[in-house]
């Protein structure tokens, strides 16, 4: 019966993941990993930091099996390791509990969770790292539950080191798992063997990574820069507007689905923790330490927007405790508790919850991919593509052959070039009349399980009448589903191209949660003629100024400013000095001719 349950669970897990393979590139890191398979260049973020040396090496070896197409290679590798990971995690939990049934059901719970249904088959490093983590748990458990030869201790140490080399972020989970295992080994000789092999294996992949960066100095500079970004963004700014309770929900509850799915899982885990403590289950300590340390670090330091995917290394610990809780209920009810039926219902609920998003991902192009394919079909050869920062990797990988730049960088170089067509590639659904929008439906699973990006993407031709150069005090574009804007700081300076226009029209707004009752801003043309804009909540303020001939500089000077992080009652970490939002700019009645279109390139680059 126990083997039948394990086999049935394996079949269900395989079917769920193999039928949920993504059709095209979707998320930010996917393009970077694909480019790394073609050319491993960690300093240029191919792949993203911190390098993933073992993952990319395995992907390069597997590439011939998938026709040397990086996207297929990485999705195939993720699918294979998802199935292998289930088997390994089942073995690991069986080793720790001594119960094949509990092992199978614990692994089944983890691999049918909404977090895994969505993320396990993406062309990223998570799935393989989780399979290696499962192998590490199994081997560490074997070393603690059996009288093993020292070779098994070496195997456990190697598995832990390879897991870290596959995805370095997993060190936060692997180190406490390995460290607690070492402490529980029977002798100092065994402990020395474990630490020795772990250090040797880590040194091997670390030396390869340093060699790929060129030198120890370059490696240190690269990693220091990434650490500084992590401290500024993930551990600080990204937590804007979120309370501690909201962050905890993001990392601990959301991976298991909505409340009606997550609460039973967490309750079972709490029951399992009680049972483990009551029985003084020594072999459970490494897994409990793994999850506890990882969750503590995540809650204190990691970006909550990506909390569900970032929580993956700690979730096997929750699944293990839930498996203990299930086994406890089965014991006290004398097998009246039908555990496999309960887990089957959970899997059904998890798929019902994530299915609408999974089916879109499987059957249709992701919005960024669809937008880029459309852009390749309409943009002339001399066009410049201005991408939103979240779409930089997509542009690098899928728009080769085009000039691609960030919005302000492109406007600075080509804003005055009326002979150069400009297109904006935006990570949002535009309201521009000439824009083309590509979108998926975004159910609750999208909101809770993803970073909130790439549900829609747009291609927007940028008319010469709406171009300007942000010279001073103008923030980069920010977008939501309802529009886009640029914050103006203590003073904003804008340069306009010479179109022979008679006037320029500017639109200002402020959000509904604006901390000031109202604000006034003086807009002047080259220090000459000026107009005052009165900006209030819920209204658009439009001002128009006459323009002299030639290139023109506009200066916008608000009367009041604020710093979001200093506003009482807000949870903001934004320390910028802000005043009002610029939501529109257009020169009226231009006399310059529109740019002549150059015949577009006939070739397309296929990906996915």
Residue ranges and their predicted role:
Residues 18-20, 210, 337-459, 464-477, ...:
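Catalytic lumenal/periplasmic loop and adjoining terminal transmembrane helix
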Residues 192-245, 258-262, 350:
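Membrane-lumen/periplasm interface segments of specific transmembrane helices
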Residues 28, 49, 115, 121-128, ...:
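Short acidic/glycine- and proline-prone juxtamembrane loop motifs at membrane-interface regions
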Residues 10-13, 106-111, 138, 160-164:
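Short helix- or helix-capping micro-motifs
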Residues 95-100, 136-153, 163:
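Membrane-interface transmembrane helices that cradle and orient dolichyl/undecaprenyl
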Residues 181-182, 254-282, 292-295:
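Hydrophobic, aromatic-rich transmembrane alpha-helices
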Residues 119-120, 126, 168, 172, ...:
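Hydrophobic/aromatic-rich transmembrane helices and adjacent perimembrane loops
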Residues 6-10, 158, 196-203, 280, ...:
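Signature aromatic-anchored transmembrane alpha helix within multi-pass, membrane-resident enzymes
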């Amino acid at each position: 019966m126990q083997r039948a349950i394990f086999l049935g669970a394996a079949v269900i897990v395989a079917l769920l993941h193999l039928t949920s393979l993504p059709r095209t590139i979707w998320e930010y890191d996917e393009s970077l990993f694909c480019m790394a398979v073609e050319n491993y260049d960690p300093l240029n973020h191919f792949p993203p930091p911190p390098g993933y040396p073992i993952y990319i090496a395995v992907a390069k070896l597997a590439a011939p099996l998938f026709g040397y197409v990086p996207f297929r290679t990485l999705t195939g590798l993720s699918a294979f390791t998802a199935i292998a990971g289930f088997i390994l995690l089942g073995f690991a939990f069986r080793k720790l509990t001594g119960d094949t049934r509990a092992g199978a059901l614990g692994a089944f719970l983890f691999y049918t969770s909404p977090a895994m249904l969505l993320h396990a088959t993406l062309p990223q490093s998570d799935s393989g790292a989780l399979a290696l983590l499962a192998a590490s748990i199994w081997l560490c458990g074997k070393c603690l539950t059996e009288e093993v030869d020292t070779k098994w201790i070496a195997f456990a140490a190697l598995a832990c080191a390879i897991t870290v080399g596959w995805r370095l972020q997993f060190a936060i989970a692997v180190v406490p798992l390995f460290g607690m295992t070492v402490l529980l080994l029977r002798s100092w000789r065994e402990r020395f063997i474990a630490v020795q092999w772990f250090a040797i294996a880590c040194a091997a992949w670390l030396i390869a990574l340093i060699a790929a960066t060129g030198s120890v100095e370059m490696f240190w500079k690269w990693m220091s820069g990434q650490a500084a970004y992590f401290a500024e963004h993930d551990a600080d700014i990204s937590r804007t507007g979120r309370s501690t309770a909201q962050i905890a929900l993001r990392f601990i509850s959301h991976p298991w689905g909505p409340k009606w799915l997550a609460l039973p899982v967490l309750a079972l885990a709490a029951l399992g923790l009680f049972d483990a403590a009551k029985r003084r289950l020594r072999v459970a300590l490494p897994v409990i330490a793994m999850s506890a340390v990882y969750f503590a670090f995540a809650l204190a330091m990691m970006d909550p927007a990506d909390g569900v995917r970032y929580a993956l290394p700690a979730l096997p610990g929750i699944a293990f405790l839930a498996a203990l809780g299930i086994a406890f209920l089965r014991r006290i009810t004398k097998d009246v508790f039908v555990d496999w039926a309960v887990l089957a219902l959970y899997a059904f609920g998890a798929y019902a919850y994530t299915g609408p998003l999974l089916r879109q991902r499987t059957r249709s192009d992701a919005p960024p991919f669809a937008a880029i394919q459309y852009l390749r079909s309409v943009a002339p050869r001399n066009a410049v593509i201005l991408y939103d920062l979240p779409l930089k990797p997509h542009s690098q990988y899928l728009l080769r052959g085009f000039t691609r730049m960030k919005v302000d960088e492109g406007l600075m170089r080509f804003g005055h070039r009326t002979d150069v067509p400009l297109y904006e590639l935006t990570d949002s659904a535009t309201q521009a009349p000439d824009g083309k929008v590509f979108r998926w439906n975004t159910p609750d699973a999208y909101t809770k399980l993803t970073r909130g990006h790439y549900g829609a993407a747009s291609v927007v031709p940028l008319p010469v009448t709406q171009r300007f150069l942000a010279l001073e005090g103008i923030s980069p574009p920010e977008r939501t589903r309802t529009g886009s804007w640029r914050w103006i700081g203590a003073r904003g300076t804008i340069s306009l191209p010479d179109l022979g226009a008679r006037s320029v029209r500017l639109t200002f707004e402020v959000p509904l949660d604006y901390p000031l009752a109202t604000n006034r801003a003086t807009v002047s043309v080259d220090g000459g003629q000026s107009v005052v804009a009165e900006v209030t909540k819920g209204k658009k303020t439009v001002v128009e100024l006459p323009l002299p001939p030639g290139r023109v500089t506009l200066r916008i000077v608000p009367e009041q400013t604020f710093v979001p992080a200093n506003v009482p009652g807000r949870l903001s970490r934004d320390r910028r000095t802000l005043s009002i939002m610029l939501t529109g700019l257009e020169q009226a009645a231009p006399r310059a001719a529109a740019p002549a279109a150059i015949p577009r390139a006939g070739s397309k680059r296929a990906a996915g």
